[in-house]
Amino acid sequence: MTQAVMLQGTASDVGKSVLAAGLCRIFYQDGLRTAPFKSQNMALNSGITSDGKEMGRAQIFQAEAAGITPDVRMNPVLLKPTSDRQAQVVLMGKVATNMDAVSYHDYKPRLREQILAVYNSLAQEYDVIVLEGAGSPAEINLRDRDIVNMGMAEMAQCPVILVADIDRGGVFAAIYGTLALLHKQERDRVKGVIINKFRGDVALLYSGIEQIESLTGVPVLGVMPWLDVDLEDEDGVALQNDKYRGNAPRDITIAIVQLPHISNFTDFNALAAQPDVRIRYIRRPEALTDADLVILPGSKNTLSDLAWLRESGMADALLQTHRQGVPVMGICGGYQMLGDTIVDEVESGLGTQPGLGLLNTITRFAQDKITTQVNATMSGELPSWLAAAAGLPVRGYEIHMGETVLQEGCCTAMTLQRNGCSVADGAVTADGLAFGTYLHGLFDSDAFTRAVVNGLRARKGLAPWETTFCYAEHKVRQFDLLAEAMRQHIDKIYTIMQQHQEPV
């Protein structure tokens, strides 16, 4: 029988996704066929499977930790917020509809049977399933239609481990309060607690651990220290917590504009891992002053974020920075914003709007979303600081609902191989100071990334780095470091799975 264990949290961003990846890595190292599963994920960081399905990035990197190919069954429901009240609903990797929160809450019971069927299908193929909840199981206003926390644990008939973040303070209150708000049958599923992100001498916690175990009857399985591991974050909460402010001095500074609806900021993890690069996510115009490159990232609401750029003064500052000779790059929604004109009758309904005008392009939004993994080749001739990237192979994925047409004065940045056909993508100006593409994951291509960074180094009179950093090997090292730390600090996971597994 397939064994399963589920991680739920006292709140969002307590570290469930990373610890789930660590469990996937441990079971993989121990020779068990393991898969991650999250029934419903709300995130703007998504990726594309080999068969063109869209799923949450968290389950993609958990699958990588487990040594398997990501499968959309690992995340059957993906919610991508388009505003404070609306979200795009992606079912089994394809866009279904847009809904507000109330409509989706009413819709959830219809998903329960489908989610269970998908889970059972996955469980038949693996020895272990590592499930992840969302937010907290103590959201009592959502309990009656829950499909992602205790509702999912009930469907999978699996034990639950509660993860609590001590770094934000109030960890014992969070543990006690969460367990107190659960129904008895839900509380009985919780077989242990992990206290996560601890800094300092763990001996200071012992008396508190004894008391919380006595008060709740639930054992603390371990205290995970704050780990300096470089792994993906599920969504923008990490940006709000200043994790990526990048204060360490490096030769090259890259400023990424933190749009209100920023998506796929995992595009820049490989850049951040470069030994000579400092990444800074910025929201204030004055923060552009020391940038060697400015990047406009993806957006789930392009025109809304473009309006924010103008209202915040960021657009004027970005254009001024560009006039001073600093290159500006756009990816997906950011690429669209760099153009002359955006025609949107789909996403926002705002019609025709002017872009920033750095690329002579016109973008028209469409109803159908392109979701595919692609191989590509950079154009054979690229100007200025991009010249070393000319002709290089790159790989990535597309997630967009717009088509961008180049006008006079722009050259194609690369050629994609999409479904067996060659497709032109991206645009670059003659001076190389404005460059855009729809290709997410571009910087995971090591040779391209080093060529770009060395081009920026040359602009500053710095010698190039001859050694190319291998991001794939770096990720493997991070998975192994995480697994080693979890083995050292957490007990009884195997015992819990073996003793508390129920037949589905």
From Swiss-Prot:
UniProt keyword annotation of Zinc present: no
Annotated transmembrane regions: none
Recorded family membership: Belongs to the CobB/CobQ family. CobQ subfamily.
Pathway: Cofactor biosynthesis; adenosylcobalamin biosynthesis
HAMAP family the record matches: CobQ
Pfam families according to UniProt: CbiA, GATase_3
GO terms for biological process, alphabetical: cobalamin biosynthetic process
Role description: Catalyzes amidations at positions B, D, E, and G on adenosylcobyrinic A,C-diamide. NH(2) groups are provided by glutamine, and one molecule of ATP is hydrogenolyzed for each amidation.
Protein name listed in UniProt: Cobyric acid synthase
GATase cobBQ-type domain boundaries: 251-448
InterPro entries: Class_I_gatase-like, CobQ/CobB/MinD/ParA_Nub-bd_dom, CobQ_GATase1, CobQ_N, CobQ_synth, GATase_3, P-loop_NTPase
Gene Ontology MF terms: ABC-type vitamin B12 transporter activity; catalytic activity
Signal sequence range: none
Active site: C332, H440
Entry annotated with the keyword Transcription: no
Keywords, in A-Z order: Cobalamin biosynthesis, Glutamine amidotransferase
